[in-house]
């Protein structure tokens, strides 16, 4: 890190955390601690292995210890709202939280995944406004992406998910998009491969917003056939470790433009950083370190 952490931690240092499982792969501690050090801010960011069973107790503990805030990742994004005091309008609409801020004992949940995804596309030179996208996934990140894309002006969104516990959540997402935005959303079963082929063929971007591709699912992909992809298609993955998932490898082989999850991670983190500190993250500096 820029400064030895022991040289800058004092009795006044405020703690910010990350709760998820698995957690050891995360680049968020590096990103935020480097940003704190660069700006001379008296915070430290630590990762905590937390799943469903521990979530309630951990939030109560964080509240009691007066943490400034924390990030939330899988599998906690759609459950943590029960233990918070308030939700931002975006988090309420999405039904998920990835950032919590503690303002004088009041815990407010925010969602920055969707804005991070759209900003990453913009920074990479991709414009999907007024166009159609196909996305796999129905968890917190996928929902945030779909809602933000719809709000930003994407014309159509086709969502694919297995008929698991998240399918009902995807049905709610489709209803929200169709009733509260000008975007048309549809939901399909992930096992309907012919429908997936059709929707990808009509889309400018295909996105994996599931954990498939990261540990313990490295080397796997939800894409049933490589010939569903075409050279002019943008293929993105929210997974950033590994930086090139099996999906992105296949996409490159098919001549597609590809985008991994690093950009989304950076820009959602920059927004969370601003929520906690009221300062702008030194994004160019962080890019040099992470990319």
UniProtKB/Swiss-Prot annotation:
<keyword id="KW-0521">NADP</keyword>
<dbReference type="GO" id="GO:0009073">
    <property type="term" value="P:aromatic amino acid family biosynthetic process"/>
</dbReference>
<comment type="pathway">
    <text>Metabolic intermediate biosynthesis; chorismate biosynthesis; chorismate from D-erythrose 4-phosphate and phosphoenolpyruvate: step 4/7.</text>
</comment>
<keyword id="KW-0057">Aromatic amino acid biosynthesis</keyword>
<dbReference type="InterPro" id="IPR013708">
    <property type="entry name" value="Shikimate_DH-bd_N"/>
</dbReference>
<dbReference type="Pfam" id="PF18317">
    <property type="entry name" value="SDH_C"/>
</dbReference>
<feature type="binding site">
    <location>
        <begin position="26"/>
        <end position="28"/>
    </location>
    <ligand>
        <name>shikimate</name>
    </ligand>
</feature>
<feature type="binding site">
    <location>
        <position position="261"/>
    </location>
    <ligand>
        <name>NADP(+)</name>
    </ligand>
</feature>
<dbReference type="InterPro" id="IPR041121">
    <property type="entry name" value="SDH_C"/>
</dbReference>
<dbReference type="GO" id="GO:0009423">
    <property type="term" value="P:chorismate biosynthetic process"/>
</dbReference>
<feature type="active site" description="Proton acceptor">
    <location>
        <position position="77"/>
    </location>
</feature>
<feature type="binding site">
    <location>
        <position position="240"/>
    </location>
    <ligand>
        <name>shikimate</name>
    </ligand>
</feature>
<protein>
    <recommendedName>
        <fullName>Shikimate dehydrogenase (NADP(+))</fullName>
        <ecNumber>1.1.1.25</ecNumber>
    </recommendedName>
</protein>
<feature type="binding site">
    <location>
        <position position="113"/>
    </location>
    <ligand>
        <name>shikimate</name>
    </ligand>
</feature>
<dbReference type="GO" id="GO:0019632">
    <property type="term" value="P:shikimate metabolic process"/>
</dbReference>
<dbReference type="Pfam" id="PF08501">
    <property type="entry name" value="Shikimate_dh_N"/>
</dbReference>
<dbReference type="InterPro" id="IPR036291">
    <property type="entry name" value="NAD(P)-bd_dom_sf"/>
</dbReference>
<comment type="subunit">
    <text>Homodimer.</text>
</comment>
<feature type="binding site">
    <location>
        <begin position="137"/>
        <end position="141"/>
    </location>
    <ligand>
        <name>NADP(+)</name>
    </ligand>
</feature>
<dbReference type="GO" id="GO:0004764">
    <property type="term" value="F:shikimate 3-dehydrogenase (NADP+) activity"/>
</dbReference>
<feature type="binding site">
    <location>
        <position position="98"/>
    </location>
    <ligand>
        <name>shikimate</name>
    </ligand>
</feature>
<dbReference type="GO" id="GO:0050661">
    <property type="term" value="F:NADP binding"/>
</dbReference>
<keyword id="KW-0028">Amino-acid biosynthesis</keyword>
<dbReference type="InterPro" id="IPR011342">
    <property type="entry name" value="Shikimate_DH"/>
</dbReference>
<dbReference type="InterPro" id="IPR022893">
    <property type="entry name" value="Shikimate_DH_fam"/>
</dbReference>
<feature type="binding site">
    <location>
        <position position="238"/>
    </location>
    <ligand>
        <name>NADP(+)</name>
    </ligand>
</feature>
<dbReference type="GO" id="GO:0008652">
    <property type="term" value="P:amino acid biosynthetic process"/>
</dbReference>
<comment type="function">
    <text>Involved in the biosynthesis of the chorismate, which leads to the biosynthesis of aromatic amino acids. Catalyzes the reversible NADPH linked reduction of 3-dehydroshikimate (DHSA) to yield shikimate (SA).</text>
</comment>
<feature type="binding site">
    <location>
        <position position="73"/>
    </location>
    <ligand>
        <name>shikimate</name>
    </ligand>
</feature>
<dbReference type="InterPro" id="IPR046346">
    <property type="entry name" value="Aminoacid_DH-like_N_sf"/>
</dbReference>
<keyword id="KW-0560">Oxidoreductase</keyword>
<comment type="similarity">
    <text>Belongs to the shikimate dehydrogenase family.</text>
</comment>
